């Protein structure tokens, strides 16, 4: 399973289509996310560490919007609670197929990993089992804003007492100066990782209609409205952050 460099937007396009998680994206996704999301490896590895604190025996651990299963792999490496299993969910058939391949490869490299189930499903309609950990790693921002509260409410209902939702998202900022500065720093991060001005511009055009970031304040207000009692930011790098939401 070779990991190809991300060159999806390297050539000029007459019309830039909306971004979709198709086979072309799957082929370059590991390179794309590493070069586009500052702090991504730190978030993924520590999601497993955080989950180990909240995981409870004989409960589900959800990876919602699993893409290629990086978070699922981290959960399996770090959680040791008896009877837990990981449920990885994505609505992209191409992502699900490759995710299964990566998780099968992980099985061959490690012993005593948690069992994992990979589902091709829509998390907006998926019935949730009782869960001690739910991870949403840069997933909510691709859900229509008007559907986010209901989804979080269903997740809250599925969470066991003492469990946690771990939510990672790109942020926007109400203060114009803060927004401009962090956006420019993020562009500098992409340039430092080898993306050209053309690639940056075309990727922005592709994704601006399908990814709708919220402010940190909006996230906190929505999570409280969904029934969570406490929201704790645990990581931020530029305009990317991760939160722990407690029931």
Curated annotation (Swiss-Prot):
Can you tell me which residues bind S-adenosyl-L-methionine?
Answer: 40, 65-67, 90-91, 122-123, 137, 204
What's a Pfam family in this record? Answer: Methyltransf_25
The record ties this protein, via InterPro entries, to: CmoA, Methyltransf_25, SAM-dependent_MTases_sf
Record flagged with keyword S-adenosyl-L-methionine: yes
Protein keywords: S-adenosyl-L-methionine, Transferase
Describe the protein's quaternary organization and the partners it interacts with.
Homodimer.
In UniProt terms, what function does this protein have? Catalyzes the conversion of S-adenosyl-L-methionine (SAM) to carboxy-S-adenosyl-L-methionine (Cx-SAM).
Q: What is this protein called?
A: Carboxy-S-adenosyl-L-methionine synthase
Organism of provenance: Pseudomonas entomophila (strain L48)
Q: Which gene encodes it?
A: cmoA
